[in-house]
């Protein structure tokens, strides 16, 4: 049996291939073009021996009558330690011009999620060294975290800082999936990892903005498969995805090309199922854990858009980046009132941390309520208690800013890693009134509270 078919139709990235009736490929089987390295993935069986496929590469130059071979298996990618320090594409082929990967084993990119009885929950905290995150939306080891934000508020910079801090402190293996993002960012990221000497612990999988929708749709699964392989070996892995929205967008493009009727806002009707299929696999089992940090672009800053709204339900912690906070020059521009975490529970993080975080949020919420009154009547019309609340809230707001290691080139000030104990001590002091006599500018862009006191001396 030849397992060969011929192309009968090409519409952009969608290719219809005809096989003899007894040899029709299964859905998700990989087909390879004769005489080229182009791979097609079967998406639908149309009947009469015709299958509809999506091209994982450029379909330029394809024409009817060209021959295609059915590999009779799914797309499989290299896994294991040989992938570390390498940049690969959606098919696991090296794109860093450093020779073959030479991995001992391959794994198919489509797999079932672990069974319910294999899952394990974790309450161990993952310290990030970023004050605002550690205080109001702490991460769990083996949890799923989303970084939500519109265009240009700092998702990728926050992601890079988290990778730098956690990869250095955590010293485990990481997998980074660049899904439909800018090639420049992928290049910056590679060099950032190289300069931080953590490249030999990171596997990089890129499917950039300029690539066909098939590549962008599958590259997240390629990265996830590599992370799952490390987890199944009994390791604790970090899995970074930048950007989940582009994964959804690629699904929308593929869905339209396959002729499905769009649903709300033009998204694919299978949005929730596709998201669930990816997210359910990003989980910790009894053998090892996957801690996942995902950047999620929010179209037009609208958190109710179907794409970010579908992602919310799968996450343990959500870090919401706000344009209003970024416009004040406070970076990281995390909104402490919008960001949430399931770990913010006194039984997990302890009474001291919990009470400090809640008091910080209460103070900021009070300031938010008073802002309209201040804008209309001015500060003088407030009661002494409210004036004190506003003063403390402004100090908290500035103390939530922090210089990043990955942004040293732009800011000119050295990055700071703040341990959790220091963070709690600083904010506890502000809300209890310990630092009421210190000017608010001393709290801006510093690490721990000791730095604030030193800065205050130089100001006074």
From Swiss-Prot:
The keyword Transport applies. It is found in: Cell inner membrane. GO terms for molecular function: ATP binding; ATP hydrolysis activity; proton-transporting ATP synthase activity, rotational mechanism. Keywords: ATP synthesis, ATP-binding, Cell inner membrane, Cell membrane, CF(1), Hydrogen ion transport, Ion transport, Membrane, Nucleotide-binding, Translocase, Transport. It catalyses: ATP + H2O + 4 H(+)(in) = ADP + phosphate + 5 H(+)(out). SMART domains: AAA. InterPro entries: AAA+_ATPase, ATP-synt_VA_C, ATP_synth_F1_bsu, ATPase_a/bsu_AS, ATPase_alpha/beta_chains, ATPase_F1/V1/A1_a/bsu_N, ATPase_F1/V1/A1_a/bsu_N_sf, ATPase_F1/V1/A1_a/bsu_nucl-bd. ATP binds at residues 149-156. Its main location: membrane. It is a peripheral membrane protein. Its EC number is 7.1.2.2. Gene3D superfamilies: 2.40.10.170, Bovine Mitochondrial F1-atpase, Atp Synthase Beta Chain, Chain D, domain 3 (1.10.1140.10), P-loop containing nucleotide triphosphate hydrolases (3.40.50.300). CDD domains: ATP-synt_F1_beta_C (cd18110), ATP-synt_F1_beta_N (cd18115), F1-ATPase_beta_CD (cd01133). It is an enzyme of class 7 (translocase). GO terms for cellular component: plasma membrane; proton-transporting ATP synthase complex. Produces ATP from ADP in the presence of a proton gradient across the membrane. The catalytic sites are hosted primarily by the beta subunits. F-type ATPases have 2 components, CF(1) - the catalytic core - and CF(0) - the membrane proton channel. CF(1) has five subunits: alpha(3), beta(3), gamma(1), delta(1), epsilon(1). CF(0) has three main subunits: a(1), b(2) and c(9-12). The alpha and beta chains form an alternating ring which encloses part of the gamma chain. CF(1) is attached to CF(0) by a central stalk formed by the gamma and epsilon chains, while a peripheral stalk is formed by the delta and b chains. Belongs to the ATPase alpha/beta chains family. This is ATP synthase subunit beta. It comes from Nitrosomonas europaea (strain ATCC 19718 / CIP 103999 / KCTC 2705 / NBRC 14298). The gene is atpD.
């Amino acid at each position: 049996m030849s397992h060969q078919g011929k192309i009968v139709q090409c519409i952009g990235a969608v290719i219809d291939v005809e096989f003899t009736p007894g040899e029709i490929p299964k859905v998700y089987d990989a087909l390879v073009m004769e005489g080229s390295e182009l791979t097609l993935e079967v998406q639908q069986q149309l009947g009469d021996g015709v299958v509809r496929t999506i091209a994982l590469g450029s379909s330029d130059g394809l024409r009817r009558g060209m021959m295609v071979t059915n590999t009779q298996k799914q797309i499989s990618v290299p896994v294991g330690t040989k992938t570390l320090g390498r940049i690969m594409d959606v098919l696991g082929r090296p794109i860093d011009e450093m020779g073959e990967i030479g991995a001992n084993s391959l794994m198919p990119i489509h797999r079932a999620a672990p069974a319910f009885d294999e899952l394990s929950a974790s309450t161990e905290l993952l310290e990030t060294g970023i004050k605002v995150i550690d205080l109001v939306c702490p991460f769990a080891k083996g949890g799923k975290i989303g970084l939500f934000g519109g265009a240009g508020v700092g998702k990728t910079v926050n992601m890079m800082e988290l990778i730098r801090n956690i990869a250095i402190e955590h010293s485990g293996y990481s997998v980074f999936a660049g899904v439909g993002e800018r090639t420049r960012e992928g290049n910056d990221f590679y060099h950032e990892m190289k300069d931080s000497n953590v490249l030999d612990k990171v596997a990089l999988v890129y499917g950039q903005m300029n690539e066909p929708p098939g590549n962008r749709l599958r590259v997240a699964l390629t990265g996830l498969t590599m992370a799952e392989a490390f987890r199944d070996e009994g390791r604790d892995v970090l899995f970074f995805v930048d950007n989940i929205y582009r994964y959804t967008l690629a699904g929308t493009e593929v869905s339209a090309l396959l002729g499905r009727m769009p649903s709300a806002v033009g998204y694919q009707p299978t949005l929730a199922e596709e998201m669930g299929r990816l997210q359910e696999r990003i989980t910790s089992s009894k053998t090892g854990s996957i801690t996942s940090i995902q950047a999620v672009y929010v179209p037009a800053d609208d958190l109710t858009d179907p794409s970010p709204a579908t992602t919310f339900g799968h996450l343990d912690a959500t870090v919401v980046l706000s344009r209003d906070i970024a416009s004040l020059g406070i970076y990281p521009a995390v909104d402490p009132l919008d960001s949430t975490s399931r770990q913010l529970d006194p039984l997990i993080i302890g009474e001291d941390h919990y009470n400090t975080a809640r008091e910080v949020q209460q103070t900021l919420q009070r300031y938010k309520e008073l802002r309209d009154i201040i804008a209309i009547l001015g500060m003088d019309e407030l009661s002494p208690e409210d004036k004190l609340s506003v003063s403390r809230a402004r100090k908290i707001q500035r103390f939530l800013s922090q210089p990043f290691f990955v942004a040293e080139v732009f800011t000119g000030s050295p990055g700071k890693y703040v341990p959790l104990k220091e963070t709690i001590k600083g904010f506890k002091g502000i809300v209890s009134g310990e630092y009421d006599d210190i000017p608010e500018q001393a709290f801006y862009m510093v690490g721990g509270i000791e730095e604030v006191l030193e800065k205050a001396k130089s100001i006074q």
